[in-house]
From Swiss-Prot:
Annotated Gene3D superfamilies: Photosystem I PsaL, reaction centre subunit XI
Predominant subcellular localization, coarse grouping: plastid
Protein name, UniProt field: Photosystem I reaction center subunit XI
Membrane protein topology class: Multi-pass membrane protein
Record GO biological process: photosynthesis
Segments crossing the lipid bilayer: 48-68, 73-93, 122-142
Organism: Thalassiosira pseudonana
Sorted UniProt keywords: Chloroplast, Membrane, Photosynthesis, Photosystem I, Plastid, Thylakoid, Transmembrane, Transmembrane helix
PANTHER family (UniProt xref): PHOTOSYSTEM I REACTION CENTER SUBUNIT XI, CHLOROPLASTIC (PTHR34803:SF2)
Any one GO cellular component localisation term in the record: chloroplast thylakoid membrane
């Protein structure tokens, strides 16, 4: 193992962030398939896909661990809490977009303009609300997925 980890360019005084984990081909392949780094996605589709993932996985903790988890409306409360958090996250994306891209600059980069960021934000909101709604419908109507 001592021969495997060595200083970058054999100079111990040069900092480098490459590790056996971060520089492996498996890690790079996994990261390249994430919607944030995938080549060829429009900002709207990028936001939609990220929103779909977030809305779908956020409803579970709210429904199972929320204060109304043992009541009849626990799932509905979890769904509404998820929508509330999605609104807060979208508001955060709006504030970031206004601060970072307030003056219109045309860098040519994919998410570095106000218009692209607004498309990303809209896709995120629609995707997250849609997937949270889909998860709510699945959890409330399919007996196999019912929360107990």
């Amino acid at each position: 193992m001592a021969n495997f980890i060595k200083p970058y360019n054999d100079d111990p005084f040069v900092g480098h962030l490459a590790t056996p984990i971060t520089s492996s081909s498996l890690t790079r392949a996994l990261l390249k398939n994430l919607p944030a780094y995938r080549f060829g996605l429009t900002p709207l589709l990028r936001g939609l896909e990220i929103g779909l993932a977030h809305g779908y996985f956020l409803i579970g903790p709210f429904a199972q661990l929320g204060p109304l988890r043992n009541s009849d409306i626990g799932l509905l409360a979890g769904f509404l809490s998820t929508i509330g958090l999605i609104l807060i996250l979208t508001l955060g994306l709006t504030i970031y977009g206004a601060a970072a891209f307030g003056q219109e600059k045309s860098n040519g980069s994919e998410l570095q303009t106000k218009k692209s960021w607004d498309q990303f934000k809209g896709g995120f909101f629609v995707g997250a609300c849609g997937s949270a709604g889909f998860a709510f419908i699945c959890l409330s109507s399919i007996p196999t997925f019912a929360l107990n």
